């Protein structure tokens, strides 16, 4: 493939996935992070180098932007930042993917101003992390882009991502998302994490 994904240099897919993206014949184009985040301006410059170049055959085509929420450094994107990044994605016809392995903790943070509905409206793919948010295993992927929905299950099958007992995975999320249990669990964890942070701060650590 000649397509690539734009991500922060600290992005999980760039550092902790044993070159899984590259193993599918795609390239990761990294951008220097600031506290784990990248900006719409940076993404615009990176994508523009291809889409506005007279000789694009010499480059990979940026087709997706990868964000983590929260980031690998525990920081959060604001709604304003997410909207700005969405605008750049629309400008160049790129997909926006949000890694939600710790989504619940980000949503429950006091300073957060992004809702699940915002993610659904502004991203092409995001997911509810389960493994790190109270489930035994697995993640619940939400695909909002009709382009990406087509044949997605076939791609899962081709890449060994279909579980024979997959309903057990779904049952976890059925329970976690019922009556907002998922958000209760993660918000409680946020409160406790802030207590630990405050204790360190009092000790000057």
Model-derived regions: residue spans:
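Conserved PLP-enzyme active-site core in the AAT-like
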Residues: 1-205
């Amino acid at each position: 493939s000649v397509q690539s994904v734009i991500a922060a240099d600290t992005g999980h897919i760039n550092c902790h996935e044993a070159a899984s993206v590259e193993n599918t014949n795609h390239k990761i184009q990294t951008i220097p992070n600031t506290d784990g985040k990248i900006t719409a301006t940076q993404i615009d410059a990176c994508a523009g180098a291809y889409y506005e170049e007279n000789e694009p055959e010499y480059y990979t085509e940026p087709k997706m932007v990868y964000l983590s929420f929260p980031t690998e450094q525990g920081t959060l994107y604001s709604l304003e930042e997410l909207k700005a990044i969405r605008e750049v994605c629309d400008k160049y016809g790129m997909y926006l993917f949000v890694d939600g392995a710790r989504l619940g903790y980000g949503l429950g943070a006091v300073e957060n101003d992004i809702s699940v509905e915002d993610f659904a409206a502004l991203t092409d793919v995001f997911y509810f992390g389960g493994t790190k948010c109270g489930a035994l295993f697995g993640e619940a992927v939400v695909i909002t882009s009709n382009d990406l929905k087509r044949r997605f299950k076939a791609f899962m099958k081709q890449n060994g991502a279909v579980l024979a007992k997959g309903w057990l995975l779904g049952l976890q999320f059925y329970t976690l998302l019922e009556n907002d249990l998922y958000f209760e669990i993660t918000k409680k964890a946020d409160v406790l994490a802030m207590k630990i942070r405050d204790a360190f701060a009092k000790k000057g650590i």
